[in-house]
Amino acid sequence: MPELRYCHGPYRGKECPVCGKPGKIMMNEAEINEVSRTLAAVLRHDPGRYGIRLDSHGYARISSLVSMFRKRKGMRWMTDDHLVYLAETDPRKRYQISGVLIRAVYGHTIDVDLTDLPTDGIPDTLYYQSSTAEAPLVKEAGIYPSDKSWIHLSGTYRKSFVSGLYHIDDPLVLAVNARSMIENGIDIFRSNDDIYLTKQVPPEYITIAEKEEVVLTDEEKDDIKRVREKNSGRD
């Protein structure tokens, strides 16, 4: 994972994308991992465990989060800027900054009202990761939230397929007729350009997607391997 640096703005990597200079190191790889893991846990899953209060839309005060981190050994250096820069450069686009507040925009297992997310720019077709065994049931009963509080749909076949590889060897990708859903009054919200949220996908909007060739990057291969090894250790 690249370092978090600052020059003409925050960025991940060795060189400023504007001038090519190395810039100032804000957080190293270990610090990014620790802060990112904890931030996701607080904003998505269990804020009370960390003594953080979220509002109904999932926002927490940045200053409260920074105070929490600064109580940890070796983290007195943490400032509001560190947290903001981390969120702004997050490669998974998990966070939204609104003034002095921050929230996660997807991945919640707690009940959070995300209906203030944008509803424009929704692709006509969205995608959902499934499996050969699960697909017949999904096509018959539809899609409903399971381990998360919202259904997560992908903007591309590739994104959905790669997401599925974190769980199984050969995902089956389903196509969702998002345009028809919206026309019939079912809300879909845009978390970012890759992830879209809804509360239900009735079966009549679901088909098996036409298969596309997907070539993984080395980074994706390494990340999938890391996550699956971690998950297998929990079994």
Curated annotation (Swiss-Prot):
Organism superkingdom: Archaea
NAD found in the keyword field: yes
EC numbers: 2.7.1.-
Matches recorded under InterPro entries: Ptrans_KptA/Tpt1, RNA_2'-PTrans_C, RNA_2'-PTrans_KptA, RNA_2'-PTrans_N
GO molecular function, a single term: NAD+ poly-ADP-ribosyltransferase activity
Pfam family of the protein (one): PTS_2-RNA
Keyword Lipid metabolism: no
A GO biological process held by the record: tRNA splicing, via endonucleolytic cleavage and ligation
Keywords assigned by UniProt, alphabetized: NAD, Transferase
Top EC group: transferase
HAMAP family assigned to the protein according to its UniProt record, in alphabetical order: KptA
Family: Belongs to the KptA/TPT1 family.
Record's function text: Removes the 2'-phosphate from RNA via an intermediate in which the phosphate is ADP-ribosylated by NAD followed by a presumed transesterification to release the RNA and generate ADP-ribose 1''-2''-cyclic phosphate (APPR>P). May function as an ADP-ribosylase.
Official protein name in the record: Probable RNA 2'-phosphotransferase
Gene that this polypeptide is encoded by: kptA
